């Protein structure tokens, strides 16, 4: 078994947790690290893009998970050192018992859809949570034209548009008023940031749909943001095309069902 560790930048506590996990793993398992973990553990590290493993253990928050899913190859087991940590599987106090389950093979691998993103036909990185087209500055409303499967949907004014996967619907899209989609669903949700008209409501489309966002108006500049990680400048006349990717995000899970994650990561936090 080959295990990789990816940790949050400049997090010495994350490195100590990685070290404690390594002490629990069988001695014949191969261990590799990203540069950040290696820096604290006095070992040789790899760029995340070079990491390929049977299990990739991330220690940090959702940002660490998303960065890993974007570049590394292998199912991710996330340990939460951040806030809500919807994409993470474990809290720190659950690590010990979970590692014993990992050693015994008592886990399952789940898959979630990713989004394929193109700018004027040129493909950029896939994303796991959402693609956001946003104005270049806060509170600068812009005009967008939205097409679904080549059919014109609407011209709208807003601060931006979010296209999210089911697993990403609990994140930025949710804060913009979008619905929560179960991760088992195959679809995308289109939601709006500060729309000019309150009558504009989020739209859910099937996963085999293609969503196109055209930057309308004259001399307009916006930013395309993927998973809060990568940014691209788009301008008037440019088209951002979003569809389901042939790639998927893989997670290692000890939970019996997806509903456990919804309950533990979303509902409990809302109720409490």
Curated annotation (Swiss-Prot):
The active site is at 62 (proton acceptor). Its EC number is 2.7.1.23. GO terms for cellular component: cytoplasm. It is found in: Cytoplasm. Coiled coil: none annotated. It catalyses: NAD(+) + ATP = ADP + NADP(+) + H(+). Its cofactor is a divalent metal cation. Involved in the regulation of the intracellular balance of NAD and NADP, and is a key enzyme in the biosynthesis of NADP. Catalyzes specifically the phosphorylation on 2'-hydroxyl of the adenosine moiety of NAD to yield NADP. NCBIfam families: PRK01185.1. PANTHER family: NAD KINASE. HAMAP family: NAD_kinase. This is NAD kinase.
